[in-house]
Amino acid sequence: MDNRRYSKIEVSKQIRFDGDNMKIKDILANKKVSVSLEVFPPKQSTAFESVKTAVHKLCDLQPSFMSVTYGAGGGIGWHTAEIAGFVQNECSVPALSHLTCLLSNRATISETLAQLKEKGIENILALRGDVPPDSSFIPAGDFNYASELVEEIHKNGDFCVGGACYPEGHVESEHIDVDLDNLKRKVDAGVDFLTTQMFFDNDILYRFLYKARERGITVPIIAGIMPVTNAKQISRICKLSGTYLPQRFKAIVDRFGDNPDTMAQAGIAYATEQIIDLIANGVNAVHIYTMNKPEIAQGIMNNLSSIIAD
């Protein structure tokens, strides 16, 4: 069986926000091309305005939705909630707020969800969160797995809940099959859609999609794409996530990595090529990790303009 063509492509308009389709599961149900963007909140209050400026430029690209990550150390923090509210209420783009649980208890999660409700945020990406490097770390007690957070979110309101998945397996997982079993439990807990960790070889994703569907995981899976624009960035990414780098991508980094402008252009081109191949093979939902760089996202969106045009 050809794992690359696991579903039939429908090249169509990219979905736009119309005020009534705030929930991501409804956006994805249209089965049209969806390109969404991710941003991270400021670490300090003094950087809030500069992040808002970048977010506004990204929103001008009319993504299907925009996700806002949690800060270092987990949790949501007021910065994440404020940026998510700005995206949705000021920029009229559906917001997806990340939420981690490893360092939180039920009371904290309930309070956070209430804050998000007040801002009209309906989409949550439920994450366990990274384990701190300190080997003596002990979880807060109420949550050990993302599946437990998914259940708790649903108890607190009518949220659309997303989850993370790992085409190459989670770094803590002993085998991809074990990882898929855990993923199935998370989906069964009430996940409406999944977003993948970054990958640089599309064949890895196609194999993962085939295995996931075999396991009965039928929710939409959004492909996460990271445009790599400098050589130091890719070294850090691979060290943290164990992401595989195909030889053709290594050649790009080796050839252009010392020139920031050239590497940025090559990184945009590589990400664009990945996305075009994904859409051509039936993966209609793509999520771009922008690193708060509007010019990078704009370069990719310009390259895709005819594919996602109205």
Q: What do the PLM-derived regions correspond to, one by one?
A:
Residues 36-50, 96-107, 162-178, 256-269:
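Active-site mouth loops of central-metabolism enzymes
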Residues 45-58, 80, 106-113, 175-185, ...:
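Short, acidic/polar
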